[in-house]
UniProtKB/Swiss-Prot annotation:
Residues 1-23 form the signal peptide. It comes from the Eukaryota. This is Oxalate oxidase GF-3.8. Residues 63-214 form the Cupin type-1 domain. It is found in: Secreted, Extracellular space, Apoplast; Cytoplasm; Secreted, Cell wall. It is an enzyme of class 1 (oxidoreductase). Its main location: secreted. Glycans are attached at N70, N75. Belongs to the germin family. GO terms for molecular function: manganese ion binding; oxalate oxidase activity. Its EC number is 1.2.3.4.
């Protein structure tokens, strides 16, 4: 009997611990916590708060997404981030945004946001939006041409891309449920990492000759 009670008590303790670990970020305990980006303290899941007397009066507003980005890039696109690093007022609030502008034929290459779900709205033009499922869904590609005023949803951690299929410029605005969603660009990560992934790993994984890997690495030298 005592042995059974000990097992039950142990399982209850483990459930409590799992609940604490898996719960979402705690709600803020103050109206505002403007990030002290210059602070020396170690930050964990957020930044230290500035004293409100030093925060100014414009931390709730930003005009950084008002201007289109320069799409004269190798991908033909430009991402303008508006996360906690650019908008300290979002600290502890669990939200951020970005704007992506596309030249005709431009792409936001396959990438992952490891810390956030994404909701986007196409503001101009038409974009092919693709979301790749995991092995659980058979690596299925979910895709659709999304036009101005239409929206799309990308679950946290799934690889996705956008491609301008129109003949004119396109743009979109996306929203994240994290103040710092981060991003992993798949081509850049594979072929432009620092230090580089060993060539035999890539040739074996991609089932190609070493020369193909060298060519791809040359395209992403310097992290571009």
């Amino acid at each position: 009997m005592g042995y059974s009670k000990n097992i039950a008590s142990g399982m209850f303790a483990m459930l409590l611990l799992a609940s604490a670990v898996l719960s979402s970020n705690p709600h803020p305990l103050q109206d505002f916590c403007v990030a002290d980006l210059d602070g020396k303290a170690v930050s964990v899941n957020g930044h230290m708060c500035k004293p409100m007397s030093e925060a100014g009066d414009d931390f709730l507003f930003s005009s950084k997404l008002a201007k289109a980005g320069n799409t004269s890039t190798p991908n033909g696109s430009a991402v303008t981030d508006l996360n906690v690093a650019e908008w300290p007022g979002t600290n502890t609030l669990g939200v951020s945004m970005n704007r992506v502008d596309f030249a005709p034929g431009g792409t936001n290459p396959p990438h992952i946001h490891p810390r956030a779900t994404e909701i986007g709205i196409v503001m101009k033009g038409e974009l092919l939006v693709g979301i790749l499922g995991s092995l659980d869904s058979g690596n299925k590609l979910y895709s659709r041409v999304v036009r101005a005023g239409e929206t799309f949803l990308i679950p946290r951690g799934l690889m996705h891309f956008q491609f301008n299929v129109g003949k004119t410029e396109a743009s979109m605005v996306v929203f994240f449920n994290s103040q710092s969603p981060s991003v992993v660009f798949v081509p850049l990560t594979l072929f432009g990492s620092n230090p580089p992934i060993p060539k035999p790993v890539l040739t074996k994984a991609l089932r190609v000759e070493a020369g193909v890997v060298e060519l791809l690495k040359s395209k992403f030298a310097g992290g571009s």
